[in-house]
């Protein structure tokens, strides 16, 4: 496994930022690390990159222990933190050459820099100062720097934070391409991010892992509760809908009604509407989104 974490714990004073979390990630996997602010996502990433020590537990990257083999771990990791640290007064290629030299690439530095500039789409920006670039292109510079030494594992903390919609799409596509031959651990609190990029998702809340599965399986967890959206043209008696067996909760939004049900009751609704003289404009069955699963797991 590229990443192995076992009973990882981090304590700040009386606060358990991480509480014995365990997970693994393999090559070719884009693993989404999803959770509300303060859940423990960034803390986990900082431990994996050797930035801060854990209180207890084991974390390994490509078989190397982050506590006792920190330098070996860093050779195998590319890290893009949430606040991308760049020298804004340096030119793009100049900065990447400097980074390559710091990483000890030696005679391979120029070829690797040129390769990364091409791969992340910086060819037209290579002679610009970093401070002149848009946020999206600055993220590309950060990704290029993180991949210069050809690491097996990429750790990306909120990689699309602050980008406009077009930049978000571009960076997501780039990460998906990178993830074909590397292990990518991607932290976010945006559900669409996970759905569009990740093979698997871990949901973390209050320092504990509350879910670890692929997206379809997570959505399947709450299939016992269906949402039926019904819209009527005229006024109806909500109490009649509530009396349908299987209807648990009704929420009204204008002339639309959201019914939380334990079974598919669309046929009963259609029959009752006809009997009561209600004009039924539309009725649809909605699957639980990852967002609804996330809310259920983190609102505890």
Which residue stretches match the model-derived regions?
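Short beta->alpha junction loops/turns
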Residues: 66, 233-234, 262, 286
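A short linear hydrophobic-aromatic micro-motif
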Residues: 121, 246-251, 279-284
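ABC transporter nucleotide-binding domain
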Residues: 170-260
């Amino acid at each position: 496994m590229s990443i192995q974490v076992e009973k990882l714990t981090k304590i700040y004073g009386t606060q358990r930022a991480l509480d014995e979390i365990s997970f693994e990630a393999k090559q070719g996997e884009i693993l989404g690390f999803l959770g509300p602010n303060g859940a423990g996502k960034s803390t986990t990433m900082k431990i994996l990159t050797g930035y801060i020590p854990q209180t207890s537990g084991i974390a390994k990257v490509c078989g190397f222990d982050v506590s006792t083999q920190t330098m070996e771990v860093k050779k195998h990791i590319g890290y893009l933190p949430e606040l991308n640290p760049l020298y804004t007064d340096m030119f793009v290629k100049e900065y990447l050459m400097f980074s390559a030299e710091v990483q000890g690439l030696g005679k391979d530095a120029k070829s690797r820099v040129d390769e990364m500039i091409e791969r992340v789409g910086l060819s037209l920006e290579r002679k610009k100062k970093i401070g002149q670039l848009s946020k999206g292109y600055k993220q590309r510079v950060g990704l290029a720097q993180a991949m210069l030494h050809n690491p097996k594992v990429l750790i990306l903390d909120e990689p699309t934070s602050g980008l406009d919609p077009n930049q978000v799409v571009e960076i997501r596509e780039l990460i998906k391409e990178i993830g074909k031959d590397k292990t990518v651990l991607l932290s976010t609190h945006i559900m669409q991010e996970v759905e569009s990029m990740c093979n698997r998702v871990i949901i973390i809340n209050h320092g504990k892992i509350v879910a670890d599965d692929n997206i379809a399986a997570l959505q399947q967890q709450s299939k016992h509760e269906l949402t039926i959206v019904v819209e009527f043209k005229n006024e109806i008696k909500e109490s009649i809908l509530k009396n349908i067996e299987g209807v648990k909760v009704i929420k009204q939004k204008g002339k639309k009604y959201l019914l939380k049900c334990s079974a598919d009751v669309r046929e009963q609704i259609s029959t009752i509407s006809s009997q009561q003289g209600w004009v039924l404009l539309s009725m649809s069955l909605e699957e639980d989104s990852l967002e609804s699963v996330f809310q259920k797991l983190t609102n505890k």
